Amino acid sequence: MDLQTQLQELKTSTQAKLAEMRGEHSKELQELRVAVLGKKGSLTELLKGLKDLPSEERPTVGKMVNEVRDVLTEAFDEAAKVVEAAKIQAQLDSESLDVTLPGRQVNLGNRHILSQIAEEIEDIFLGMGFQIVDGFEVETDYYNFERMNLPKDHPARDMQDTFYITEEILLRTHTSPVQARTLDKHDFSKGPLKMISPGRVFRRDTDDATHSHQFHQIEGLVVGKNISMGDLKGTLEMIIQKMFGAERRIRLRPSYFPFTEPSVEVDVSCFKCGGKGCNVCKNTGWIEILGAGMVHPQVLEMSGVDSEEYSGFAFGLGQERIAMLRYGINDIRGFYQGDVRFSEQFK
């Protein structure tokens, strides 16, 4: 039998065997591939016969060998796909799924308590006609300090209190720069400016139960004609009562902030004793909660606002402070440690 006939028979017989392969024949398929195309396989043995052919026949037979090899290689690849698909289908047919079984329980997360507090406060202010304005966490010395009427020698500008990146660039110590930038652009012909600016702020504090090198503030600003201290008090009373209950009262104590004049500390009647005196309020009946005041005329003038025609008030409160008072939390570090046992209490 000549070599060409043997090649044709090898191709035909191999294709016939491949056509019979099923899902359970994956092992047999691999064995057949090795027997036909392997280093010691049938095709390799036939190739050895090329050297015995006359020189004029070798190119034709050699070409036929390559064609047979290509055809069989492709046939084996296709058979492997068929066998694998049949194997998978057999597995699917043999297994059943009980659709009445309960699904796996998914552990859902929840909003962080600080996010909840921020959203609650923002919703209150939106209902009062305020706008919410975000700003840069990396600020210039000019907007963070000078525009807030903080002179160069003010203690708050000391390196111990502020994270400086360069001599003129720093991590903001409050969200007041957002107010200054907004005040610069506001068109008072369209009405007064009413805004809050929430966000993270940074101080060079040593972390302990009541201090953190970063925390969250929400600062508010209202500027318009005939804005008075009475407007400030009424606004703060509404906020405190919505946050802590309608029975809460506030009081204003004189204080000092460079960017407000006059300035006040705002206290709220104790949540625990109702103002009678207890360990929470240190027997005073009051708890300090935020700082506020009338916008300093110089701050208005630096934004090009006529302080003779316009006035305003500003205030700032901390989200952590609100949460700690509302829920009786004693350690501010709990907000940042990612302990699920802590955070899941506030679902």
Curated annotation (Swiss-Prot):
- InterPro entries from the UniProt entry: aa-tRNA-synth_II, aa-tRNA-synth_II/BPL/LPL, Phe-tRNA-synth_IIc_asu, Phe-tRNA_ligase_II_N, Phe_tRNA_ligase_alpha1_bac, Phenylalanyl-tRNA_Synthase, tRNA-bd_arm
- Provide a Gene Ontology MF annotation, just one: magnesium ion binding
Coiled-coil annotation reads: none
Enzyme class, broadest EC rank:
ligase
CDD domains with a match to the protein in the record: PheRS_alpha_core
Query: Which cell locations does it reside in?
Result: Cytoplasm
Q: Where does Mg(2+) bind?
A: 261
UniProt catalytic activity = tRNA(Phe) + L-phenylalanine + ATP = L-phenylalanyl-tRNA(Phe) + AMP + diphosphate + H(+)
Q: How does the cofactor bind to this protein, according to its record?
A: Binds 2 magnesium ions per tetramer.
Question: One GO BP annotation here?
Answer: phenylalanyl-tRNA aminoacylation
Gene3D superfamilies, per this entry?
Answer: Bira Bifunctional Protein, Domain 2
- Superkingdom as given in the UniProt entry: Bacteria
- Quaternary state and interactors: Tetramer of two alpha and two beta subunits.
Which NCBIfam families does this entry report, sorted A to Z?
pheS
Protein name per the record = Phenylalanine--tRNA ligase alpha subunit
Q: Which organism is the protein's source?
A: Streptococcus thermophilus (strain ATCC BAA-491 / LMD-9)
The lineage is: Bacteria, Bacillati, Bacillota, Bacilli, Lactobacillales
